[in-house]
Amino acid sequence: VCREVWKREKGLSYTGQTVQVPLPAGQGTGMGKPLKLINHPVRADIPVWWASLKDLSVEATAELADGWLPVFFMPDKFEQVWGAALKKGSAKRSPSLKPLEISAGGLLAIDESLVGEAKDKVLDMARPNVALYVGGMGARGKNFYNDICREYGYEHEAAEIQDLYLSGKKDEAARAVPREM
């Protein structure tokens, strides 16, 4: 839908499972008609990037988006979590789209003094945020970030972090985040 709007070729009409443009008669003001974007985009090809987590949304990302913003991305393990969904979506990808780009963020610390155990000082800054997502973003059994950590092979650690976090022990949950995670 966004790409059609940005093209500005004609007024937008779209009927999908969840979106209808313009609204059908009897909804909204009842004056709905296909409209064309008034503004002229600075560039014709505006990249669409999705931050998706679970199989169906990752599959749709690989099929439709220009780029993917995964969370907790581990280059040596990501295929065991998202590989099948990425392959399935890529197989349906339009040849008119460029290959899917992946941008996995992370923390960066540049300091020559951070060697050996001193590296943990940097990791300690990240641990509370990881604990929040793995332990506190969702109910027990319905936390997508916790699920990802389990799929990476950190079942015990993810359960412990969540147990601590949900029982109000946020600092302990942060300390339970292992260095490898």
Predicted regions and their residues:
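Divalent-metal (Mg2+/Mn2+/Ca2+)-assisted nucleotide/phosphate chemistry catalytic cores
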Residues: N39-H40, A60
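A local structural motif
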Residues: P41-P47
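Short, acidic/polar
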Residues: A51-A60, A126
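Hydrophobic faces of well-ordered beta-strands that scaffold small-molecule active sites
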Residues: V48-A51, W68-P70, I102-G106
